[in-house]
Amino acid sequence: MVHLWVRAEQRAHEERVGVTPEGVAARVKAGVRVTVEQSSVRAIGIEGYVAAGCEVGVENSWPDAPEDAIVFGLKELPEDGLPLRHRHIMFGHAYKGQPAGRVLLDRLKAGGGTLYDLEYLVGEDGRRVAAFGYWAGYAGAAVALKCWAAQARGGICGPLTRHDGKAALLADLAAEFLGLSRPRAIIIGALGRVGTGAADCLTAMGLAVTKWDMAETASGGPFAEVLGHEIFLNCILARPGCPVFVPASALRADRALTVIGDIACDPTSDFSPIKVYDRATEWDAPALRVAVDPVLDVTAIDNLPSMLPVESSVDYAGQLLPSLLTLGDLGGGVWRRAKLEFDRHVAV
């Protein structure tokens, strides 16, 4: 019998979950054993999962889960260096040259574990079967707007908070923009899920948005147009061959650009298209000031959808559920492709 173990998230400001009570009910009905850990922060309460027929585990007890359990979470595990013996479904951030990713792969190798990276669950056409992209784009645009509004008032963006939904987030932004003009914004990757979410947020706030995608960046750069907007949102994942959108020279350039929202958030990747910063930012300090004359702030947070934890979890879980229903066949379909990706990278 397949045993799915849904762990509590241990990262600060992470309330999302990848399966809803309805999804658990579907797994239980299909004959799967499901354990859901208690969580002090999860946006969806344990009561719904219990009603769906799951077993309840102690918060953060996944290291002691049975050997055959498939441990399912979203964000990174504690960096304690211990070998990992289970099969893990999560966002590993381990295949694009990230230093922390190599550490994760080495821990899995040492313990005999396996990573089924959620970013690499793809169909036969190579497209991801589930993604938080829309919500990352929406929340990322909101944070960039907060950064710009703080600049306009002579400051820097303060700590972020979660919101009960898009309406609450937009109301918060509207209050911050009272008496302010609207900046010009450009999105690269505008046709994808992330870019669509970003554009929806900006449009809802009354901004004129320049939307670029592959056709507009095919020349390889340089891209002076990016520096001609007050806000730039990067919605393109770092990968080999990706052009540089903001070179290091932009720090000293004559530019309108004052806020970069790196929603893709791969600053430690060798292929990052933004060369003016080298580390992610956090909820408590969302803006990194990389230049002062003229000012330039970068915001790059890798769990943006947790600003809207319920909406983003429900949407993502619905996309992922058909694949979770095939966990009994880890040797086929999306799971086989994810395992091949893991095998290729762990062997390096």
Predicted segments — roles?
Residues I70-A152:
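Phosphate/diphosphate ligand-binding glycine-rich loop within oxidoreductases
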Residues K75-E76, G92-H93, I236-G241, A264-C265, ...:
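Short glycine-/small-residue-rich Rossmann-like dinucleotide-binding loops
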